[in-house]
From Swiss-Prot:
NCBIfam families from the UniProt entry: rpsG_bact
A single MF term (Gene Ontology): mRNA binding
Primary role: One of the primary rRNA binding proteins, it binds directly to 16S rRNA where it nucleates assembly of the head domain of the 30S subunit. Is located at the subunit interface close to the decoding center, probably blocks exit of the E-site tRNA.
Keywords assigned: Ribonucleoprotein, Ribosomal protein, RNA-binding, rRNA-binding, tRNA-binding
Organism: Thermotoga maritima (strain ATCC 43589 / DSM 3109 / JCM 10099 / NBRC 100826 / MSB8)
UniProt-recorded name of the protein: Small ribosomal subunit protein uS7
GO cellular component: cytosolic small ribosomal subunit; ribosome
PROSITE patterns: RIBOSOMAL_S7
Family per record: Belongs to the universal ribosomal protein uS7 family.
Alphabetized InterPro entries for the sequence: Ribosomal_uS7 (IPR000235), Ribosomal_uS7_bac/org-type (IPR005717), Ribosomal_uS7_CS (IPR020606), Ribosomal_uS7_dom (IPR023798), Ribosomal_uS7_dom_sf (IPR036823)
Signal sequence annotation: none
SUPFAM superfamilies in UniProt: Ribosomal protein S7
Subunit structure: Part of the 30S ribosomal subunit. Contacts proteins S9 and S11.
Alphabetical list of HAMAP family matching this protein: Ribosomal_uS7_B
């Protein structure tokens, strides 16, 4: 166990939109510390979003993340030799990071096109409450609902 709680890092906002959420997305897309490539991918995806939806890409992205954020998740808890999947509420910082992770994973899972196109498509899908990231959220909620009987084991 830790001696004390790890302090949250302050992430500086991204240079183009001046938004912390976009900076977090860039960090999630980034591989091997190649931030400029990640920025090109994200900003390219935002350009595609602007073309396809004719709306502000930042608003579309924010709404997409809001739609993907999970409210509940299950955590394993051992009680007397049996492991139960206990539904718990997700804290706000974790909600955001899960949403971003699921959007990026869903985009990476698609094959055969440039990453910026896949990312733009996934963000637009999440904005419209469809797509793989939304499915992941619904599956998580379904698991929590199915294990509702064990909610009294929360800690």
């Amino acid at each position: 166990m830790r001696r004390r709680r790890a302090e949250k890092r302050q992430i500086p906002p991204d240079p183009v939109f001046g938004d912390v959420l976009v900076a977090k997305l860039i960090n999630r897309v980034m591989w091997d510390g190649k931030k400029t490539i990640a920025q090109k991918i994200v900003y390219g995806a935002f350009d595609i979003i602007r073309e396809k939806t004719k709306k502000d890409p930042l608003e579309v992205f924010r709404q997409a993340v809001e739609n993907v954020k999970p409210v509940l998740e299950v955590r394993p808890r051992r009680v007397g030799g049996a492991t139960y999947q206990v539904p718990i509420e997700v804290q706000e910082p974790r909600r955001t990071s899960l949403a971003l992770r699921w959007i990026v994973e869903a985009a990476r899972a698609k094959k055969g096109r440039p990453m910026k196109e896949k990312l733009a498509e996934e963000i637009i899908a999440a904005y419209n409450n469809t797509g793989t990231a939304i499915k992941k959220k619904e599956d998580t909620h379904r698991m929590a609902e199915a294990n509702r009987a064990f909610a009294h084991y929360r800690w």
